[in-house]
A protein has these predicted regions:
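Core SAM-dependent methyltransferase catalytic element
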Residues: 561-564, 615-628
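Short glycine-dipeptide loop
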Residues: 480-484, 560-566
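Conserved class I S-adenosyl-L-methionine
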Residues: 260-267
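Glycine-rich SAM-binding Motif I of class I
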Residues: 271-275
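Short beta-strand element of Class I
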Residues: 283-285
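Nucleic-acid modification enzymes, centered on SAM-dependent nucleic-acid methyltransferases
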Residues: 6-257, 287-521, 571-594, 605, ...
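Surface-exposed cleft-lining segments at the edges of enzyme active sites
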Residues: 531-546
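A short glycine-rich, Lys/Arg-flanked "PGG" loop and its adjoining helix->strand segment in the class I
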Residues: 546-562
Length: 628
């Protein structure tokens, strides 16, 4: 059986093409053939036997980079399980030629047991919303069967476009209240999803409209839009060093974990690396030291939130905002809030930008806190937090209340479309468990030995980013002041935050553990280099960081199952001022040595372009693949 994995035509980075081959190789458990141009395959058997419609489908909307897909010749395997997980592919085709009596057995083996014998009389079969089967009969009784699969990830990315369609964009004329307004929007979303699924099956001869006035879903999904598609809740909040969702999802596949397994991110941040795990039937645990990161991750990973309760809470909130604005006396609380923010920011530019909006922000926050459901309250507060970040980064004349309402509506509609599509595809958004734990990855006493099926993470890159500064005002408004005890997350590398007691006893006491930690030669060489360059403070930060990372490696080794994998995304190189000159130092090998020093085997290193919005001092990343 041939399997052709056709990459998305709108890949955002050429490196994604090569990462896509890594992913499909892992999913198929074989080495695929790199296909530069798909049309050249039409000269080969069995592609030269395909009908025109199938050839048109395969060669339509191909990537214009260095390659267009990957080909494998393998025994029949369950392809449906693969299309539920694959990241970088617009379509995946399976093609096989066999005797008539074998067709049903092969279809069953690739994950399509629902096809009936009488259906094989048809030239085209649509067994489900994401599959098409094309059958061609030969005179000798054999049949050429082509199965076209639409990967779930592609459909979930495209479903975010339905909220741009006229039925969902324009406020209906008969909307007299928020209840009716949201009902009409939901009807528009559902109509758009039906249009999307129908178009993906039958709209392949339609040319997209590129200009203004787009009215058809094909105008949005059939061309490489410059707009970044934002599936699920990946982009609901700005957070330093946030990983690219496509890379994150593919990393889960490189771990070779199966449904029901559990993955761990020991430096989970805002949850980007594990947010897709529930969509793939995988359980996930994240460890995060900052309350703001944990709170964002809790929301981001909760795609199965009760939409009925959420809509009721949003309508109640909007009605409250519309009828009660500024009727409350907030002068005393507003004064206290301003003083607190002024104290921690020193009246910097961010404070000056946000100060005119603080009264309205405080009003919205108090209105949100009336919500009874804690999950919904957290969701609403995080969206408010994002507006705080936006308004503290740039001077904005617009009303923050209207901006918040618009953003909340947008995120609700994304959730609504995601849940509706999940129902159609049979994806249980609450079928897997995700737990975000406030804690320290150097002391994961909440996890037993040999219980984790795979680890993936992107730890802090030495001293490249401050994960607190851009969220400082938001942290203060949300009342997460504990996050500011370190001033900078670099302070967390210090020995006094390492502990040997239970994980939930923060802040931690001073331990002498650091003094007994042996670092590899590559780590010591870097520390000595910084010390000789009169960078005493910098050398100490780096030394603390490396010791912390070694302790984390030890804990990860302890909890990971035998022969399982740990994928770490880390900066390939780093720049420091040494003896008055900027020096670029290869830092990825230093982390690799640390992993090996606790027992891990380094089985692969994957280089790729930066997958983060906040580059800091980093240009290229390495993915270190360790195995226990």
């Amino acid at each position: 059986m041939l399997v052709l994995a056709k990459v998305k035509f709108d890949l955002r980075d050429p490196d994604e093409l090569y990462f896509a081959q890594r992913e499909i190789d892992a999913l198929l458990n074989t080495k695929t053939r790199f296909i530069k141009t798909i049309p050249t395959l039409i000269k080969e058997r069995p592609f030269n036997l395909l009908d025109d419609e199938v050839i048109h489908l395969i060669s339509r909307l191909t990537y214009m980079g260095e390659g267009q897909g990957f080909l494998a010749d393998i025994p029949p395997i369950n392809i449906v399980n693969i299309i539920k997980r694959a990241t970088f592919f617009r379509e995946i085709y399976t093609i096989f030629e066999t005797e008539e009596e074998n067709v049903l057995n092969i279809l069953k083996s690739i994950g399509l047991p629902m096809v009936k014998l009488e259906e094989l009389k048809n030239k085209k079969i649509d067994p489900n919303p994401y599959t098409q089967i094309f059958i061609k009969d030969f005179t000798d009784g054999n049949r050429l069967v082509t199965v076209r699969f639409l990967p779930f990830q592609t459909l979930f990315e495209y479903v975010t476009e339905v909220k741009k369609l006229p039925a969902a964009v324009f406020r209906p004329k008969n909307s007299e209240n928020w209840e009716t307004y949201f009902k009409e929007k939901e009807i528009g979303i559902e109509k758009g999803i039906r249009e999307l699924l129908e178009h993906m099956k039958t709209g392949h001869y339609r040319s997209p409209h590129f200009g203004l006035g787009k009215k058809h879903i094909g105008d949005f999904v059939d061309w490489a839009s410059t707009d970044l598609r934002k599936p699920f809740l990946h982009y609901l909040h700005k957070y330093k060093g946030k990983g690219d969702p496509r890379i994150s999802r593919a990393l889960i596949n490189l771990l070779k974990v199966k449904e029901g397994d559990t993955v761990l991110d020991p430096f989970v941040g805002s949850g980007a690396f594990i947010a897709d795990a529930p969509m793939m039937g995988i359980n996930a645990i994240g460890i995060e030291v900052l309350n703001i990161g944990k709170m964002i991750a809790d929301v981001k990973c909760n795609l199965g939130i009760d939409l009925i309760d959420l809509r009721k809470s949003i309508i109640k909130l909007f009605n409250l905002i519309d009828t009660s604005i500024f009727k409350q006396d907030l002068k005393a609380e507003l004064f206290d809030l301003k003083e607190k923010i002024r104290k921690y920011t020193g009246e910097n530019s961010a404070y000056k930008k946000i100060e005119p909006h603080l009264e309205k922000i405080l009003f919205i926050k108090k209105a949100i806190e009336e919500a009874e459901n804690d999950e919904i309250k957290k969701f609403l507060l995080i969206l408010l937090s994002q507006q705080v970040v936006e308004y503290s980064e740039k001077s904005r004349a617009g009303d923050i209340i209207n901006s918040f309402k618009s953003y909340l509506e947008d995120r609700y509609l994304v959730l609504y479309s995601t849940q509706k599509l999940a129902g159609i595809l049979g994806v249980n958004l609450n079928g897997s468990k995700v737990k975000i734990i406030k804690g320290d990855s150097t002391n994961m006493t909440m996890l037993k030995d040999n219980t984790i099926d795979g680890i993936l993470t992107s730890p802090p890159y030495f001293d490249a980013l401050d994960y607190i500064e851009n969220n400082k005002i938001s942290i203060l408004i949300l009342g997460l002041d504990e996050d500011l005890v370190w001033e900078s997350t670099k302070n967390f590398y210090e020995a006094k935050y390492r502990d040997e007691t239970e994980h939930n006893n923060l802040p931690l006491f001073v331990s002498d553990k650091y003094f007994s930690i042996d670092l590899p030669k590559s780590s010591m060489h870097l520390i000595e280099l910084l010390q000789k360059s009169r960078g005493t403070y910098k050398a100490k930060v780096v030394e603390n960081y490396l010791k912390m990372m070694k302790l984390s490696f030890k804990e990860c080794y302890r909890v990971l199952k035998e022969s399982k994998y740990y994928l770490m995304v880390i900066s390939k190189r780093h720049s420091w001022i040494i003896e008055g000159k900027e020096e670029v130092i290869e830092t990825s090998p230093i982390l690799a040595d640390l992993g090996r020093s606790v027992g891990f085997k380094l089985v692969d290193v994957i280089e790729h372009g930066l997958s983060k919005a906040d580059k800091g001092k980093i240009g290229v990343e390495d993915i270190l693949m360790f195995q226990k």
